[in-house]
Amino acid sequence: MIQTKDIIELTDTYGANNYHPLPIVISKAEGVWVEDPEGNRYMDLLSAYSAVNQGHRHPKIINALIDQANRVTLTSRAFHSDQLGPWYEKVAKLTNKEMVLPMNTGAEAVETAIKTVRRWAYDVKKVEANRAEIIVCEDNFHGRTMGSVSMSSNEEYKRGFGPMLPGIVVIPYGDLEALKAAITPNTAAFILEPIQGEAGINIPPAGYLKEAFEVCKKENVLFVADEIQTGLSRTGKVFACDWDNVTPDMYILGKALGGGVFPISCVAANRDILGVFEPGSHGSTFGGNPLACAVSIAALEVLEEEKLTERSLQLGEKLVGQLKEIDNPMITEVRGKGLFIGIELNEPARPYCEQLKAAGLLCKETHENVIRIAPPLVISEEDLEWAFQKIKAVLS
């Protein structure tokens, strides 16, 4: 049987060097546990950046995949499929929106949002042609495509890829006065993460989302929430915007929408926003394909049936409390909502992630000095306690 070192050697030989993963190969997974080719077991505390909220290979989701794969997998959007309509309805009701536009990856959904708000600005708000502006936040992460990279404040993400998309205005995260000052008659939208994931689980001040939404509403600016990582129960609410009782003008969803089994993403908004499209103005051959829709319907049902939102809230509150009790001056802050938790250190986090791997836990550093803790939401209290004891031992 092929071994870990052989797989890593093949990857390093033939793969573009655009990732720096921990030196582990995952060959099997179930629930919160993964296994390498040698049979070593690890607990997954990353959940594929919150794409595996329902746990690895959830039986209901896998059965939906198999059942649909045995019937039809792809029709393109040239024809209707029997899965797309029911999926539309499910997502529309979940988001309380009138329309949904499906894509495949989170970054594609972000690009779709950019196109939507720009066209809305021209067709509805009557902004002068090619003058629309989008406000974003420092330290955001919306993906790796050109539109997403153009919105980034990280110059390393942009290096060698210019010219960037024009009309992007960057303001500090959580700064209401900066938002007010940045809005002009040409502003189409304010796009933000309700909690910044790649920035180190960066949580805005209490009430900020609500106040920012009200500012946008007053100024006729669309409030767009990128809930690709934070949405679908991860933070102890169905959507992270729910913490401030905000229903944004547009949701951007992905990751856990496919249950960690098949990529699917979307934007959801009302007809006065998504109605700006006509046939041929946007599309995706695989977007909304029947296989993805069947998987996604099952994935959303699992979140509801197993009460994973409530589970995330309960277990997250307990774990954050425990982590805050670890006595080590190296830990500068523990913060989180639900099972979306960051442990900020005053030194690089990578060596500690490597120590946690040796102890049987898979974590990933983010923003250089933050350990991200985001296990599948199906994790048991016993497994979470086991994980905490390992984390405590490494960080003590």
Swiss-Prot record:
<dbReference type="InterPro" id="IPR050103">
    <property type="entry name" value="Class-III_PLP-dep_AT"/>
</dbReference>
<feature type="modified residue" description="N6-(pyridoxal phosphate)lysine">
    <location>
        <position position="255"/>
    </location>
</feature>
<protein>
    <recommendedName>
        <fullName>Ornithine aminotransferase</fullName>
        <ecNumber>2.6.1.13</ecNumber>
    </recommendedName>
</protein>
<keyword id="KW-0641">Proline biosynthesis</keyword>
<comment type="pathway">
    <text>Amino-acid biosynthesis; L-proline biosynthesis; L-glutamate 5-semialdehyde from L-ornithine: step 1/1.</text>
</comment>
<dbReference type="InterPro" id="IPR005814">
    <property type="entry name" value="Aminotrans_3"/>
</dbReference>
<dbReference type="InterPro" id="IPR034757">
    <property type="entry name" value="Ornith_aminotrans_bact"/>
</dbReference>
<keyword id="KW-0663">Pyridoxal phosphate</keyword>
<dbReference type="InterPro" id="IPR049704">
    <property type="entry name" value="Aminotrans_3_PPA_site"/>
</dbReference>
<dbReference type="GO" id="GO:0030170">
    <property type="term" value="F:pyridoxal phosphate binding"/>
</dbReference>
<keyword id="KW-0032">Aminotransferase</keyword>
<dbReference type="InterPro" id="IPR010164">
    <property type="entry name" value="Orn_aminotrans"/>
</dbReference>
<dbReference type="GO" id="GO:0005737">
    <property type="term" value="C:cytoplasm"/>
</dbReference>
<keyword id="KW-0963">Cytoplasm</keyword>
<comment type="similarity">
    <text>Belongs to the class-III pyridoxal-phosphate-dependent aminotransferase family. OAT subfamily.</text>
</comment>
<keyword id="KW-0808">Transferase</keyword>
<dbReference type="InterPro" id="IPR015421">
    <property type="entry name" value="PyrdxlP-dep_Trfase_major"/>
</dbReference>
<dbReference type="InterPro" id="IPR015422">
    <property type="entry name" value="PyrdxlP-dep_Trfase_small"/>
</dbReference>
<dbReference type="GO" id="GO:0055129">
    <property type="term" value="P:L-proline biosynthetic process"/>
</dbReference>
<dbReference type="GO" id="GO:0004587">
    <property type="term" value="F:ornithine aminotransferase activity"/>
</dbReference>
<dbReference type="InterPro" id="IPR015424">
    <property type="entry name" value="PyrdxlP-dep_Trfase"/>
</dbReference>
<dbReference type="Pfam" id="PF00202">
    <property type="entry name" value="Aminotran_3"/>
</dbReference>
<comment type="function">
    <text>Catalyzes the interconversion of ornithine to glutamate semialdehyde.</text>
</comment>
<keyword id="KW-0028">Amino-acid biosynthesis</keyword>
<dbReference type="GO" id="GO:0042802">
    <property type="term" value="F:identical protein binding"/>
</dbReference>
